[in-house]
From Swiss-Prot:
Keywords: Methyltransferase, S-adenosyl-L-methionine, Transferase, tRNA processing
Binding site for substrate: K122, D154, T192, E193, Y194, E195
Protein name (database record): tRNA (guanine-N(7)-)-methyltransferase
Stretches the record annotates as Interaction with RNA: 124-129
GO terms for cellular component: tRNA methyltransferase complex
Pathway: tRNA modification; N(7)-methylguanine-tRNA biosynthesis
Alphabetized SUPFAM superfamilies for the sequence: S-adenosyl-L-methionine-dependent methyltransferases
Alphabetical list of HAMAP family matching this protein: tRNA_methyltr_TrmB
Keyword tRNA processing included in the entry's annotation: yes
Length: 214
């Protein structure tokens, strides 16, 4: 979902280079230097307004987190929260998920989250889906062997597409849930803003957890 431009977004981003990087091509292999100490490194691609990644950083102080978001207005909303919270294990990136191998080195990421990505339902836009094979190839390159990819969506079509895409890519599924909020196997779900609204209206949430075969 596109957010309206916010006049305060760019000045806020420019004022906090210690918390946010813009298209960080020179950070490959050096991400731990952005945190107060080295910890396992987790990446969310498409962080939206940031409720999920902020809560994860608060809940798991033993991990480092990176929130990557393409929209300036959205990442600025996360930055507003981080300016107030000053979480030592959270860094923000204004950048494109299509450029991950420019931002991260091979095997640098311990886990990756895709939450409520744009479904791009038209066939001609298939290559823009974050579970298209070209994206999967980048995830595989930057993730450690057996690192987990967690994917959540409310869009049944995108979920089914993602299952097929990942299966064709040779991934192994650790969890497939057709109704996440009623799945007793999942006890540690952290919802996004959108997820809370959608499920409160009776919507169904789909989730899969998978890893690459090496």
């Amino acid at each position: 979902m596109r957010l309206r431009n916010k006049q305060w977004a760019k000045p806020l981003i420019l004022a906090h280079p210690e918390m946010i990087l813009v298209r960080p091509e020179k950070m490959q292999g050096h991400w731990q230097s952005r945190f107060d100490q080295a910890r396992p490194l987790y990446l969310e691609v498409g962080s939206g307004k940031g409720q999920f990644i902020v809560e994860m950083a608060k809940t798991h102080p033993d991990r480092n987190f990176i929130a990557l978001e393409l929209q300036e207005a959205a990442v600025a909303m996360i930055l507003k929260k981080q300016v107030a919270l000053k979480l030592p294990n959270l860094q923000l990136v204004l950048g494109d998920g299509a450029d991950l191998t420019d931002y991260f080195s091979e095997g640098e990421i311990d886990g990756l989250f895709l939450n409520f990505s744009d479904p791009w339902p038209k066939t001609r836009h298939e290559k823009r889906r974050l579970t298209y094979r070209d994206f999967l190839r980048q995830y595989q390159a930057i993730m450690k062997p057996d690192a987990l990819l967690q994917f959540k969506t409310d869009n049944q079509g995108l979920f089914e597409y993602s299952l097929v895409s990942m299966n064709h890519f040779g991934m192994t599924f650790d969890l497939v849930s057709l109704n996440l909020h009623h799945d007793k196997r999942v006890t540690d779900n952290v919802p996004t803003e959108y997820e809370e609204k959608f499920s409160a209206d009776g919507g169904r949430i789909y989730e899969l957890v998978a890893h690459f075969k090496h």
